[in-house]
Amino acid sequence: MVIAIKKGQLVKAIVCEEFGKISDIKWKDVDNPNINEEEVLIRVLAAGVNYPDSLIVQGLYQFKPMVPFSPGHEGAGIVERVGTNVTGFKEGDRVFFLTNFGAFSEKISVHYTQAFHLGLKVSFEVGASAFMTYGTSYHALVQRANISANKKVLVLGGAGGVGLAAIDIAKSFGSEVVAVVSNKKKANLCKEYGADKTIIIDDSLDEKSLTEVLKTQAGSRSE
């Protein structure tokens, strides 16, 4: 069963009408999304912008939605409608969500298992930027590397979203963290997130020289 939204209602969205340049996406009116019995309708108040969003617009991502579509993998907002089979959510709940695309819209419908409650002390902006950064780092460090307190973790691109999340997660496990960055400002940011040591890399270094610097300053047991 589909719960229909009143016809004529429109919402604003960033729309990719055909794969191509990022500059070709448009801000336009689209139909208010319907929901089925296992979906929730969310009024989006914040959305995360990530590298895969640029790839999907250009048709370079691992899957291609049917055009036109609205990009955006993650966001946060307020539940406005719930499907008849949805459990754990009600209208008015604060949530953050993960989706393949569609977050760059005023409203989105997602399966209720893709939405999660957002604490009152957590802003919509923070909730909307958590999945792609912390999710990526958690998968790499916890699910793949089996991180533990006796490991030393080397984080390349330490001052980026995924890098900062990696520092945060690694420190929560008691690991020693070395962050690699390109300037002092980024190094200071990594230290604020808990990095034990930072390495500032000169962009002019070739691959061999870079490897030697990392071995010397980070240590051979860094992962």
Where do the language-model regions lie?
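Adenosine-nucleotide cofactor-binding segment
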Residues: 155, 171-223
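Residues forming the Rossmann-fold NAD(P)(H) cofactor-binding site
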Residues: 164
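NAD(P)H dinucleotide-binding glycine-rich loop of Rossmann-like/cofactor-binding domains
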Residues: 55, 94-157
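N-terminal Rossmann NAD(P)H-binding glycine-rich loop of SDR-like oxidoreductase domains
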Residues: 159, 167
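Eukaryotic N-terminal low-complexity, Ser/Thr- and Lys/Arg-rich leader segments
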Residues: 1-11
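Glycine-rich beta-strand-centered segment in the early N-terminal region that forms part
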Residues: 31-49, 60-102
